[in-house]
Amino acid sequence: MREILHIQGGQCGNQIGSKFWEVVCDEHGIDPTGRYVGNSDLQLERVNVYYNEASCGRYVPRAILMDLEPGTMDSVRTGPYGQIFRPDNFVFGQSGAGNNWAKGHYTEGAELIDAVLDVVRKEAENCDCLQGFQVCHSLGGGTGSGMGTLLISKIREEYPDRMMLTFSVFPSPKVSDTVVEPYNATLSVHQLVENADECMVLDNEALYDICFRTLKLTTPSFGDLNHLISATMSGVTCCLRFPGQLNSDLRKLAVNLIPFPRLHFFMVGFAPLTSRGSQQYRALTVPELTQQMWDSKNMMCAADPRHGRYLTASAMFRGKMSTKEVDEQMINVQNKNSSYFVEWIPNNVKSSVCDIAPRGLSMASTFIGNSTSIQEMFRRVSEQFTAMFRRKAFLHWYTGEGMDEMEFTEAESNMNDLVSEYQQYQDATADDEGEYEEDEDEEEILDHE
């Protein structure tokens, strides 16, 4: 019941995704061959959200792995949990997308997409009551961004009433892998605004900072970054996988977090984050978790919530704790920092509690915030985009794959619209509702055109 299909695409998506499966397998007591070796009935109670039980009693992840080159998948296959995936669910091409969104979305990716959709259908038919899809990808490359958004739009057509959740790694301000990241990211956001229900925004630089400052790692590797992401991913979905006092699912999450359909890009955080050496000196209490969870240094994307206001937020606590204390702490945060929450959405913080803590911790919490300050990220990418697009730099790589400049202009203006929508609601107060009604009528007229 309530299954989620997991799809990972491109190098980044496959690396994050395989780390996620290591964490989830560990939490459910499933070993790398798919056998159950756990010690608690709770691990198996809702194991079918993410796993299919095969005839011989093995548990197989409901995961689909795709890429336009075989390299990353080979390393997933030879990795610690590589043998647990269904071999048919590895779908890969040979050519690679070469960090080119157009190759992923229109040419190379379009040739492979039907093979991926066949696997998606097969997995969806195996579900009792499919709740939705979660997609792991990056927006800076070619496959995860171009082919990832193509797949999302195709799934949208075929399963319009299912939730679509993405874990999207945005290009970072200082750490850049490729020159054309701003192009790829802007074209992807253009798609995600329309076709995804919820986007968890991640960004390597913020993750580096967490590893460096909070976890005191001198040379953080991608493995360390992905470990942070997988802790968050596991936290977002723990309510679905374990019993809890206040449960939520993907749809409840969306209903509580998204006041306006386009504004579905969330900041995520995780607590407790402690360096390996200092764990034993830390007392874990609900107030301490709450404090760290709302800390701007804890956010996994490079935007500072203090520069904007929270429209809504959701906190998921895990472990044995009193729900009364959780509620008190959350109200406390809102009262002390009321200027950081929009006053025209009362009670805009939802909390849920799941009884099972992650491995090695007595309690933990995952934070998801819909903050207007996320416009900083879009603004930054947009500036880099404009700087290059004004000179038409690197455009021939995209037009050569059949793209039109018009599409770039549309994506650019869609992203700028998104930024100004966030700004509009950041400045809004509870009194000036008259202005809005007019704006909304105008928007409707535009929509119908």
From Swiss-Prot:
Acidic residues composition-biased segments: 429-449
UniProt cross-references to Gene3D superfamilies, sorted A to Z: Helix hairpin bin (1.10.287.600), Tubulin/FtsZ, C-terminal domain (3.30.1330.20), Tubulin/FtsZ, GTPase domain (3.40.50.1440)
GO biological process, one term: microtubule-based process
Alphabetized UniProt keyword annotations: Cytoplasm, Cytoskeleton, GTP-binding, Magnesium, Metal-binding, Microtubule, Nucleotide-binding
CDD domains: beta_tubulin
Cellular component GO terms, alphabetical: microtubule; microtubule cytoskeleton; plastid
Membrane-spanning intervals of the chain: none
Binding-site residues, GTP: 11, 69, 138, 142-144, 204, 226
Annotated stretches, region: Disordered: 425-449
Pfam families given in the database record: Tubulin, Tubulin_C
Keyword Nucleotidyltransferase: no
Subunit structure: Dimer of alpha and beta chains. A typical microtubule is a hollow water-filled tube with an outer diameter of 25 nm and an inner diameter of 15 nM. Alpha-beta heterodimers associate head-to-tail to form protofilaments running lengthwise along the microtubule wall with the beta-tubulin subunit facing the microtubule plus end conferring a structural polarity. Microtubules usually have 13 protofilaments but different protofilament numbers can be found in some organisms and specialized cells.
Misc. remarks from the entry: There are nine genes coding for beta-tubulin.
Function of the molecule: Tubulin is the major constituent of microtubules, a cylinder consisting of laterally associated linear protofilaments composed of alpha- and beta-tubulin heterodimers. Microtubules grow by the addition of GTP-tubulin dimers to the microtubule end, where a stabilizing cap forms. Below the cap, tubulin dimers are in GDP-bound state, owing to GTPase activity of alpha-tubulin.
Family of this protein: Belongs to the tubulin family.
Protein name listed in UniProt: Tubulin beta-6 chain
Provenance organism: Arabidopsis thaliana (Mouse-ear cress)
GN (gene name): TUBB6
